[in-house]
Amino acid sequence: MLEEAGEVLENMLKASCLPLGFIVFLPAVLLLVAPPLPAADAAHEFTVYRMQQYDLQGQPYGTRNAVLNTEARTMAAEVLSRRCVLMRLLDFSYEQYQKALRQSAGAVVIILPRAMAAVPQDVVRQFMEIEPEMLAMETAVPVYFAVEDEALLSIYKQTQAASASQGSASAAEVLLRTATANGFQMVTSGVQSKAVSDWLIASVEGRLTGLGGEDLPTIVIVAHYDAFGVAPWLSLGADSNGSGVSVLLELARLFSRLYTYKRTHAAYNLLFFASGGGKFNYQGTKRWLEDNLDHTDSSLLQDNVAFVLCLDTVGRGSSLHLHVSKPPREGTLQHAFLRELETVAAHQFPEVRFSMVHKRINLAEDVLAWEHERFAIRRLPAFTLSHLESHRDGQRSSIMDVRSRVDSKTLTRNTRIIAEALTRVIYNLTEKGTPPDMPVFTEQMQIQQEQLDSVMDWLTNQPRAAQLVDKDSTFLSTLEHHLSRYLKDVKQHHVKADKRDPEFVFYDQLKQVMNAYRVKPAVFDLLLAVGIAAYLGMAYVAVQHFSLLYKTVQRLLVKAKTQ
């Protein structure tokens, strides 16, 4: 039998019997000539940043899941159920996001451009409006953000092409394309998120003591340092509130120089406070006030507070607004500061539009509008200075708030307006006859734009979400060191959520590694199994009826020779 098989094989090779040769040699040829899939194309690993997940006042916000293991699709696909929906920021809309959630998508991955500063302004404004709505809608769908690279962009385009072809083809074409197309399985490396216990929110304070008796009035200058956006690891908070912290540090530098000399040492205590947890209902400020007003007998906040100035989002725009919960009465120091702000803006910077915005505190809201409301609740005169007219402006809580959104000249100008107005109040310069158009900070005492820029660069070089800044972070130690250069008694204050009834709860798994594996669909395995079964069936029939096959081949060979 083996000799006969060898003879048949030899005759097939000599006579080039195409049908049988095709059947016998095709599988081996395909295995030999098929190029192996490059490792880079077979799998791609990239970093993803999860959407916010936190509880505030017992109310859950953001996404509640972190685990992802499902096949990729784009919005062009008709069926999104249990699929990882890829979206590019430039094509993103809230309607598409809601559609993916309604269809029970397995996950959503939003691809961000590499250079956020180059994103068109209309796209930036639209996404800033969408972010609060995304967070307000609690969802069980994992939502991730990824920064675009060439491999990820290629994955998106291939997935988009496959999704689009399925929606516009016939059933047979869809089946064929589904069987032959390449898909991508998206898998995260982390585990399910869980609550972080005993998380501390840290704040930093420092002071400049006034010259004179013990019962000197105190001016408090406050700015919260933490940033907020739809994804904590992408929250740089340049304007909100890196600009406020930059101004606070520059004011500390300027007044520390004035308080160094007896001739310019004013009869006011200056208390500087860089608060944490500002984006979470000002938790750092709340605990700081409780510690100073309820749990101690010696505090500058208990004695004689002239007013509290909160700085929030002052790095761009051509206007400044002083937000108050109660309009200041004439004859008070806070009213004098309001008038000095108006005077400096009108005479030294006429291009700046200044106004006072009055808004009552709404205790029915889960989150206070502005930081000064924390002080107003404790009956301390306070206001917030910002270039934003409304606390609902999306610029206060967006991952789009990057370094390029802060204009250096505008930040320097606003710092000068604040410093000039404070100085005129503290030293009573208007009553002493100083012309309103005469600047105080000139020559060696002028505002340093380079200093403001370097601080802004440092602040926006790292995410400052409250979930990422612990008490031992390099950011806090650097901030504390910076304040120690100019102020006395610099120290940290910590707030930890109550275990029984926590006001805030943070969750982990905010940054993960995601793998995109190139895979064939399940129907491809089915068709492949059918093809293999058919081939094996043909081979089985050929072996079982080898004598018939042998005679047929001989007859064909004889006919070929006679011709």
From Swiss-Prot:
Glycans are attached at N241, N428. Residues 43-522 are lumenal. It comes from the Eukaryota. GO terms for cellular component: endoplasmic reticulum membrane; membrane; multi-pass translocon complex; protein-containing complex. Residues 544-563 are cytoplasmic. Belongs to the nicastrin family. One of its GO terms (molecular function) is ribosome binding. Residues 1-42 form the signal peptide. The lineage of its organism: Eukaryota, Metazoa, Chordata, Craniata, Vertebrata. This is BOS complex subunit NCLN. GO terms for biological process: determination of left/right asymmetry in lateral mesoderm; multi-pass transmembrane protein insertion into ER membrane; negative regulation of nodal signaling pathway; protein stabilization; regulation of protein complex stability; regulation of protein-containing complex assembly; regulation of signal transduction. Highly expressed in pancreas and skeletal muscle and, at lower levels, in heart. Component of the back of Sec61 (BOS) complex, composed of NCLN/Nicalin, NOMO (NOMO1, NOMO2 or NOMO3) and TMEM147. The BOS complex is part of the multi-pass translocon (MPT) complex, composed of three subcomplexes, the GEL complex (composed of RAB5IF/OPTI and TMCO1), the BOS complex (composed of NCLN/Nicalin, NOMO and TMEM147) and the PAT complex (composed of WDR83OS/Asterix and CCDC47). The MPT complex associates with the SEC61 complex. Keywords: Endoplasmic reticulum, Glycoprotein, Membrane, Signal, Transmembrane, Transmembrane helix.
